[in-house]
Amino acid sequence: MTIINSISSLGKITNKNKSQNNLNSINNSINPPNNIQGSNEKTGLVSGLLELVGGVVLILGLVVGATLGL
């Protein structure tokens, strides 16, 4: 059950990030950031995506381990 809850939480985090990215896009089109802020936002987005991917890989590893009885 914990695995299902974790996957559900990841989905909620992803949706929240999409909403935030949409808000950021709207805000940036109204007030374009300078280059430094823009590059920082992209770096934050990439690290956030890498964190999500790492979480999914960890959960998949737990599922496979539990299935194989390791």
Swiss-Prot record:
Pfam families xrefs: Coiled
Superkingdom per UniProt: Eukaryota
Family: Belongs to the UPF0519 family.
Protein name listed in UniProt: UPF0519 protein B
The species this protein was found in: Dictyostelium discoideum
Gene: sigN122
